[in-house]
Curated annotation (Swiss-Prot):
GO cellular component annotations of the record: cytoplasm; cytosol; membrane
Alphabetized UniProt keyword annotations: Cytoplasm, Magnesium, Metal-binding, Pantothenate biosynthesis, Transferase
SUBUNIT field: Homodecamer; pentamer of dimers.
Catalytic site: 181 (proton acceptor)
Encoding gene per record: panB
Protein name: 3-methyl-2-oxobutanoate hydroxymethyltransferase
Species this chain originates from: Escherichia coli (strain K12)
Statement: the UniProt record of this protein carries the keyword Cytoplasm: yes
Length: 264
């Protein structure tokens, strides 16, 4: 099988072909996802909550991300693999480059970082040094203490305009992908249409180019709060492989996420 690349996702955007992505943290699930054709994965700092049992993503380290990235890469050698740079791993461009190099050596194809225009210099530096970047705007979980909880972002004209400005700035700096989390559908549509790069949504309606879910949410094995945007595909199929196929099919057809999973 040919490796999945960012160029393929750019082609999907141009063709208006929706695509599914998912978080992965280990060899076995990564192999299962790849076997079913789900070939874009993220080693997210969400592992702090889903795997390590913390109440936020903040305790996750670069070493944690690198460890899980290597495991996922062994399970899915041809996937397009994104890896989060965790909290305080990119406070300066130089620090970002050093830590990005660590997760890239572990097997990542691209690093994901949370934040807006303040990251422009960092995105430029990484891109110039052959480290592809995925931006992340909206509800950025590493900023939970600033937001005062996990809340929808970008409501109102001023907040929406700022997120659009941030998105355009990240794209101009060289970001090749963007994750939009927990924003109103109307804003997600504006941003997706304004950018040439693919936009992946989570809690952003079905108007983005792609979707991502934390795998534990997709299979209904979360220990606590279930996000509004989550759907338990395993409950409907009773089989993990069938659940993966249904998730992909519903994303590609625009059935998921539905109105009940979206914000306004």
């Amino acid at each position: 099988m040919k490796p999945t690349t960012i160029s393929l996702l750019q082609k999907y955007k141009q063709e208006k072909k929706r695509f599914a992505t998912i978080t992965a943290y280990d060899y076995s699930f990564a192999k299962l996802f790849a076997d079913e054709g789900l070939n874009v994965m993220l080693v997210g700092d969400s592992l702090g909550m889903t795997v390590q049992g913390h109440d936020s993503t903040l305790p996750v380290t670069v070493a944690d991300i690198a460890y899980h990235t290597a495991a996922v890469r062994r399970g899915a050698p041809n996937c397009l693999l994104l890896a989060d740079l965790p909290f305080m791993a990119y406070a300066t461009p130089e620090q970002a480059f050093e830590n990005a190099a660590t997760v890239m050596r572990a097997g990542a194809n691209m690093v994901k970082i949370e934040g807006g225009e303040w990251l422009v210099e960092t995105v430029q530096m990484l891109t110039e040094r052959a480290v592809p970047v995925c931006g992340h705007l909206g509800l950025t979980p590493q900023s939970v203490n600033i937001f005062g909880g996990y809340k929808v972002q970008g409501r109102g004209d001023e907040a929406g305009d700022q997120l659009l400005s941030d998105a355009l700035a990240l794209e101009a700096a060289g970001a090749q992908l963007l994750v939009l989390e927990c924003v109103p559908v109307e804003l997600a549509k504006r941003i997706t249409e304004a950018l040439a790069i693919p936009v992946i949504g989570i809690g952003a309606g079905n108007v983005t180019d792609g979707q991502i879910l934390v795998m534990h949410d997709a299979f209904g094995i979360t220990g606590g709060h279930i996000p509004k945007f989550a759907k338990n595909f395993l409950a409907e199929t009773g089989d993990i492989r069938a659940a993966v196929r249904q998730y992909m099919a519903e994303v590609e057809s625009g059935v998921y996420p539905g109105e009940e999973h979206s914000f306004h």
